[in-house]
Amino acid sequence: MAHDHTNGCSDCGNLSRRDFVRTMGGAALAVGSVGAGGLLQAAPSSKSVAETAAAELYGSLSESQKKVIAFGFDHPLRKKISANWAITKPTIGDDFYTSSQRVLIDRVVRGVMSSDGYDRVMQQMEDDNGGFSEYHIALFGQPGQSETGGFEFELTGRHLTLRADGNSVDGVAFGGPIVYGHGISDPKKQLYYDQTQAADMVFKSLDAKQAVAASIGTEPKETAVLLAGKSGTFPGIRVGELSKDQQKLVLATIQTVLAPYRKEDVKEALKVLKAGGGVKTLNMAFYTAADLANDKIWDVWRLEGPTWVSYFRGAPHVHAYLNVGLKNV
């Protein structure tokens, strides 16, 4: 059962104006570096920390373990999107795994997160489902076997999907769609409230006409996060129609969304965004039926473009989806 989050993540919480200004600078710098063409080598590789641990984990599995949690790279389970599911039956804390295998699983999770992001996700797992030991993993493909499709580690459970794929799927950030959340109904106590605050700064920068264009009544279904490509139509206001200062706020929101993850994935995500036409091709929508605190800080919002879907559903608690790629997995 979820309980109130009161500690465990020292850097989580409200986003101060000073922090947001610093984030804006980081976002502008990051997107500028994409334009310089310096991110071609930015994606994770088989030698990245998380992927190295995942390969070691695979090598440690017995044949009986492989029959339960190891699949071909193109298995349908790798493509499923859900905010609450067990990709395989054993939990990390089960006797199914050895203590050394649990250490390796933790190393993968540390490897795909930033320092703050790791603290958040561990607190999230504790609050939402009793901790890291209650989540599930699967392995797809085999390490070093690129000719068979690739190799990917995936962790799932309540409000969480994380992946490490060593760029097995070129042009797809994070190895495919990822999920995060928090089962707390008070927005200001949600672990990812800083993302709502960042989006709210965009909304509060809009003039009356822009606010009408950005405001939508009913949100799309929760799992509507597949990439639509350049032929897609997107809800809300087009970011390219906003002022430069407003676009910087959108960039800062993107950087806030990406902040929990490792630098390699962040850089690849920004590269993919650039390849899709950049931030100006995105639309941003705010779903005004969702206002938990009755404060006109909209709890559900969406950033979407040809290569990007960030869908944050903060009501009745957080279910959030991030899908960044030149194609769907």
Describe each PLM feature range.
Residues 1-19, 28, 33:
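N-terminal secretory signal peptides
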Residues 40-42:
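Boundary at the C-terminal end of the N-terminal hydrophobic targeting segment
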Residues 44-63, 67-114, 119-329:
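A cross-kingdom marker for long, charged
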